[in-house]
């Protein structure tokens, strides 16, 4: 029997920033080393859960899609009962569960996870929204445990400066870390994994190379 509860990793961010792409990449990289499951949140559908299943991220019984209705942030903050129930269900199905990724529905920069629901929070933004996003602040930018700045390969095409985003992220976050990624190509993924293992106090499994 395992000696500690499953690590709950909340992954938030605006629509289209790359949350589901990050969850998919994390599952595929870690599933042979850890007992993993996923909870996704969508307002009216289970689209993200179905996407992860279709793309073979995990077996279907390890993915639960929650239909939140209304504002997505309510289901991860003010009333997290549906998500807590889903996490509880997964723990019952898989007693050896080590990590649960909880993907929020797409929301604005003010969305945050309840500490009752998430042990670690990752917040995903993308350069296509403009290099001004980090300095706009909001709890996702300033208080998440890790800020993921995705789609860096598209920066030149949309006129976004990674140097500006780097500077503003440092100013807004202080000592809190951030990582630039191109999840489509896997760039930066190992650094995200290393952060989760280190800060989530997971045992580094044999065969999983350090970042």
Curated annotation (Swiss-Prot):
<dbReference type="GO" id="GO:0016151">
    <property type="term" value="F:nickel cation binding"/>
</dbReference>
<dbReference type="Pfam" id="PF02492">
    <property type="entry name" value="cobW"/>
</dbReference>
<keyword id="KW-0342">GTP-binding</keyword>
<keyword id="KW-0963">Cytoplasm</keyword>
<protein>
    <recommendedName>
        <fullName>Urease accessory protein UreG</fullName>
    </recommendedName>
</protein>
<dbReference type="InterPro" id="IPR003495">
    <property type="entry name" value="CobW/HypB/UreG_nucleotide-bd"/>
</dbReference>
<comment type="subunit">
    <text>Homodimer. UreD, UreF and UreG form a complex that acts as a GTP-hydrolysis-dependent molecular chaperone, activating the urease apoprotein by helping to assemble the nickel containing metallocenter of UreC. The UreE protein probably delivers the nickel.</text>
</comment>
<dbReference type="GO" id="GO:0043419">
    <property type="term" value="P:urea catabolic process"/>
</dbReference>
<comment type="similarity">
    <text>Belongs to the SIMIBI class G3E GTPase family. UreG subfamily.</text>
</comment>
<keyword id="KW-0996">Nickel insertion</keyword>
<dbReference type="InterPro" id="IPR004400">
    <property type="entry name" value="UreG"/>
</dbReference>
<dbReference type="GO" id="GO:0005737">
    <property type="term" value="C:cytoplasm"/>
</dbReference>
<feature type="binding site">
    <location>
        <begin position="13"/>
        <end position="20"/>
    </location>
    <ligand>
        <name>GTP</name>
    </ligand>
</feature>
<dbReference type="InterPro" id="IPR027417">
    <property type="entry name" value="P-loop_NTPase"/>
</dbReference>
<dbReference type="GO" id="GO:0005525">
    <property type="term" value="F:GTP binding"/>
</dbReference>
<dbReference type="GO" id="GO:0003924">
    <property type="term" value="F:GTPase activity"/>
</dbReference>
<keyword id="KW-0547">Nucleotide-binding</keyword>
<comment type="function">
    <text>Facilitates the functional incorporation of the urease nickel metallocenter. This process requires GTP hydrolysis, probably effectuated by UreG.</text>
</comment>
<keyword id="KW-0143">Chaperone</keyword>
């Amino acid at each position: 029997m395992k000696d500690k509860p499953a690590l709950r990793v909340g992954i938030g961010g605006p629509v289209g920033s790359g949350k589901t792409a990050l969850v998919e990449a994390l599952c595929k990289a870690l599933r042979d080393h850890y007992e993993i499951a996923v909870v996704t949140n969508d307002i009216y559908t289970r689209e993200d859960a179905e996407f992860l299943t279709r793309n073979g991220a995990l077996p279907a019984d390890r993915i639960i899609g929650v239909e939140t209705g209304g504002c997505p942030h309510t289901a991860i903050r003010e009333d997290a009962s549906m998500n807590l129930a889903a996490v509880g269900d997964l723990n019952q199905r898989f007693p050896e569960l080590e990590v649960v990724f909880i993907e929020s529905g797409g929301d604005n920069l003010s969305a945050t996870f309840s500490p009752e629901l998430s042990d670690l929070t990752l917040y995903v933004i993308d350069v296509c929204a403009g290099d001004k996003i980090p300095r706009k602040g909001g709890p996702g930018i300033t208080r998440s445990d890790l800020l993921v700045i995705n789609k860096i390969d598209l920066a030149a095409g949309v006129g976004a400066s990674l140097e500006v985003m780097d500077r503003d992220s440092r100013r807004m976050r202080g000592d809190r870390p951030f990582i630039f990624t191109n999840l489509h190509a896997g760039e930066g993924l190992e650094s995200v994994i290393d952060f989760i293992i280190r800060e989530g106090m997971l045992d580094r499994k044999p065969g999983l190379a350090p970042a």
